[in-house]
Amino acid sequence: MRIAIDIDSTLHHYWDRLSDAALRRFGIDLPYEEQLDWGITRLRHDQLHLCIKETHCEKAILAGEPYPDAVDTVARWHAEGHFIHVTSHRDPDAWDATARWLTQIGVPFDDLYCAHDKVSRCVELGIELLIDDSPENLLRAVDAGILVATIVHPWNRELCEEEDVMCADDWRGLAAKLDSLLRRRARVRP
């Protein structure tokens, strides 16, 4: 199967980093449990951009700690022959640091894409399953005929309750939900 996997808030917990940057730079608290939709309304666009830039610098990227079971799950899927496309809204300039981080933590990948239009790239690559936290990306992928899954967060919980999205609280649960699908759809990487 051809699998696309997001990074921030999917392979590792990103919200704490973003929230820390907002508090340090602007004195604005961004409580995780209160982030009930995809828009971050407590920050102006320029403030959000600065916080994202800070959290996507090389030092911050290389310090990222993956979620428990994320690395082992993705590595197992890759070893089973699944194509792994890692995708992120990170700026293209973050590609090198992101590739080093993935190698450093042990996540194998066949393709890495850092740009904003993830779903178009997924369609271009023939991706069959997208794992992402963004409700916008999940819905666009469903519209494109791509299966979707997510780690549950406050901003995507409602989508999990209403749409055909495979959801789990953590990577262990996500792997349990996806493994039978992946066994049925196994295909050697092209």
Residue ranges and their predicted role:
Residues 51-59:
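Short glycine/proline- and acidic residue-enriched helix-loop micro-motifs
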Residues 58-86, 91-97:
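Short, acidic loop-to-helix structural element flanking the phosphoryl-transfer center
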Residues 83-84, 109, 148:
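Hydrophobic anchor at the start of a short beta-strand
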Residues 89-144:
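Substrate-recognition "cap/lid" segment bordering the active-site pocket of phosphatases
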Residues 119, 135-190:
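Asp-based, Mg2+/Mn2+-dependent phosphohydrolase catalytic module
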